[in-house]
Amino acid sequence: MADAQNISLDSPGSVGAVAVPVVFALIFLLGTVGNGLVLAVLLQPGPSAWQEPGSTTDLFILNLAVADLCFILCCVPFQATIYTLDAWLFGALVCKAVHLLIYLTMYASSFTLAAVSVDRYLAVRHPLRSRALRTPRNARAAVGLVWLLAALFSAPYLSYYGTVRYGALELCVPAWEDARRRALDVATFAAGYLLPVAVVSLAYGRTLRFLWAAVGPAGAAAAEARRRATGRAGRAMLAVAALYALCWGPHHALILCFWYGRFAFSPATYACRLASHCLAYANSCLNPLVYALASRHFRARFRRLWPCGRRRRHRARRALRRVRPASSGPPGCPGDARPSGRLLAGGGQGPEPREGPVHGGEAARGPE
């Protein structure tokens, strides 16, 4: 992160020396557990967490969880040492690798959010025509393209950072001259934040406009049906995209202020940079909360991870089988004593009386 590495805390006994490790430890713990559980929920066999057959949304959420987990495990612990220790202890290679992974996962998350916003727009606006395009195979190809683009855009950060000696201390700091650093920081803001947020805003804006543009009673009913069918995944991914914009926006804004505004180094500006970095890092541990709050099907699949949830589901199925009426089988089964038609004098069967009970096909449905 830009220039935060140059400034250490004033003293080990300062408030920051205590608060920073606590905040980073919470981010690490919540992010690791939360994204690990998201992976466990999505990788278990069963229907989509969003009740969409062949859902591409699950694949995109899985990719977001992988990117967030990689960021939490590989970047947050090392970044915490930058703010709490006076020197960099891990060598030049780790210095370069950590900052490469920071921007690699940032690009992967932003590009995935842009892809899923387009996916949701196609699902709502062209539900039939987009079926051939919105397949798990194409979603996996899109995920591969996301990581390829993320690797290309983040590759310059392999040389952007390096280690320098400052007296007896080794520091992990930006190694490029100012002109090149400014050009890359502006390009990162444009490609990793501004463009994905614009795509997400346009896609969800057109989606919401289409959902609410019903004309007449028939149009209103159709729009309400579309809202019910696409609401769970759409609301969740819209919330995730909004969180990304809110959490990463201050970080990019401060970098632009550093290059194009008045941003003198002081305790106040240091606190602002630290707060912006913590907010950006916290984005990786907030997404699992959104999934859990947005979808009852996601919560149900989460409960199935635990033995008590599986036992409760098994008992419910056994109780359902015990109370199922004997006549719930298809016509002609031994439990169905009622003939399916009216006997005629010649031994044949006539049509069902109109005022009689429900047809055998309806009775066969049983409790849902």
Swiss-Prot record:
Q: List the disulfide bonds.
A: 95-172
Q: What is the lineage of its organism?
A: Eukaryota, Metazoa, Chordata, Craniata, Vertebrata
Record GO biological process: adenylate cyclase-modulating G protein-coupled receptor signaling pathway; chemical synaptic transmission; feeding behavior; G protein-coupled receptor signaling pathway, coupled to cyclic nucleotide second messenger; galanin-activated signaling pathway; learning or memory; neuropeptide signaling pathway; positive regulation of transcription by RNA polymerase II
Keywords for the protein's UniProt record, in alphabetical order: Cell membrane, Disulfide bond, G-protein coupled receptor, Glycoprotein, Lipoprotein, Membrane, Palmitate, Receptor, Transducer, Transmembrane, Transmembrane helix
Q: Which family does it belong to?
A: Belongs to the G-protein coupled receptor 1 family.
Q: Which domain of life is it from?
A: Eukaryota
Give the Pfam families listed for this entry: 7tm_1
| InterPro entries in alphabetical order | Galanin_rcpt (IPR000405), Galnin_3_rcpt (IPR003908), GPCR_Rhodpsn (IPR000276), GPCR_Rhodpsn_7TM (IPR017452)
Where is the chain membrane-spanning? 21-41, 58-78, 97-118, 139-159, 185-205, 237-257, 260-280
Lipidation, S-palmitoyl cysteine type: 308
PROSITE patterns, sorted: G_PROTEIN_RECEP_F1_1 (PS00237), G_PROTEIN_RECEP_F1_2 (PS50262)
Ranges in the topological domain labelled Cytoplasmic: 42-57, 119-138, 206-236, 281-368
Report the main location listed first in the record. Answer: membrane
**Which species is this record about?**
Homo sapiens (Human)
Q: Provide the function of this protein.
A: Receptor for the hormone galanin. Receptor for the hormone spexin-1.
The protein's recorded glycosylation sites are: 6
The protein depicted here goes by the name: Galanin receptor type 3
One cellular component term (GO) for this entry is:
membrane
In the record, what terms sit under GO molecular function?
Answer: galanin receptor activity; peptide hormone binding
Identify its membrane topology class.
Multi-pass membrane protein
Q: Where in the cell is it found?
A: Cell membrane
Q: Which residues lie on this side of the membrane: Extracellular?
A: 1-20, 79-96, 160-184, 258-259
